[in-house]
Amino acid sequence: MRCIIRKVNYRRSLAIFEDVFGDYGYFEMLGKDGLEEDDVIVGNLHNLGGEVIVNDRTGEKYDVFIEAFGMSLKIAMEQVFKEK
């Protein structure tokens, strides 16, 4: 599935994505950062847990942990940018 990165919290290594259905989710970037807003990514983002995604432009692979999907942007923003 193709998704677009909409927001990134680099401090917490979390990224919000928008899927082809207009729903949002977020994942933790494991090991390396490098994804930016408006990057198109490809992967199985509708499964919770560990996945490998690919940056469609660069072909670079990223290990991620999908925390949630199927939510509104507002809820995703609250989760990704909340203070601990």
In which residue ranges do the predicted regions lie?
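Structural detector for short beta-strands of small beta-barrel domains
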Residues: 1-10
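Short, Lys/Arg- and Gly-enriched loop/turn segments at beta-strand edges
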Residues: 46-57
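Short solvent-exposed strand/turn elements
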Residues: 19-25, 81-84
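Short peripheral tails and domain-boundary helices/loops at the edges of structured domains
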Residues: 56-84
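Short aromatic-glycine-enriched beta-strand elements
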Residues: 11-16
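Beta-strand/loop nucleic-acid-binding surfaces
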Residues: 23-35
